[in-house]
């Protein structure tokens, strides 16, 4: 396959202008009151993060007293949100207005370095009742 036919997703970009709203992303494989009119394929958002030394020190101190380790919780939530936003951007770039079957996956690439992948199927949907309008 020539390099001209390969779609690339920019990962260092300014905030995207969405045509896929967060409300139009689901873990289900169908959307109530909508019909899928076109499947555009798999879309994904990948973020690779490492822990910083100061956060690791703070988390170590929190483990001594127990409870929720807020430093890691915040890092995990921020990373998942970023991967999700990149997935939505990718769906927008391929012309989708919804994503079905959304999932997350994580992989530890090396000590302290983790990849978070958000993925799903980009689709074009339309309301089942023609009088209703799609809201992005």
What is each residue range found by the language model?
Residues 1-53, 116-136:
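N-terminal presequence-like segments and the immediate start of the first folded domain
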Residues 43, 48, 56-102:
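Short, well-ordered alpha-helical segments
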Residues 98-110, 133-135:
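Short, conserved loop-to-beta-strand elements that form functional interface hotspots
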Residues 112-114:
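Positively charged, aromatic-enriched nucleic acid-contacting surfaces
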């Amino acid at each position: 396959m020539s390099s001209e036919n390969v779609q690339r997703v920019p990962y260092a970009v300014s905030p995207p202008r969405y045509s896929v709203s967060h409300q139009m992303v689901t873990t289900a494989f169908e959307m109530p009151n909508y019909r899928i009119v076109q499947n555009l394929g798999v879309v994904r958002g990948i973020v690779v993060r490492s822990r910083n030394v100061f956060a690791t020190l703070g988390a170590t101190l929190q483990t001594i007293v127990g409870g929720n380790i807020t430093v890691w919780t915040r890092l995990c939530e921020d990373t998942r949100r970023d991967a999700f936003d990149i997935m939505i951007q990718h769906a927008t770039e391929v012309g989708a207005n919804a994503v079905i079957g959304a999932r997350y996956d994580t992989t530890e690439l090396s000590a302290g370095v983790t990849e978070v992948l958000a993925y799903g199927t980009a689709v074009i949907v339309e309301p089942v009742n023609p009088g209703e309008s799609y809201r992005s």
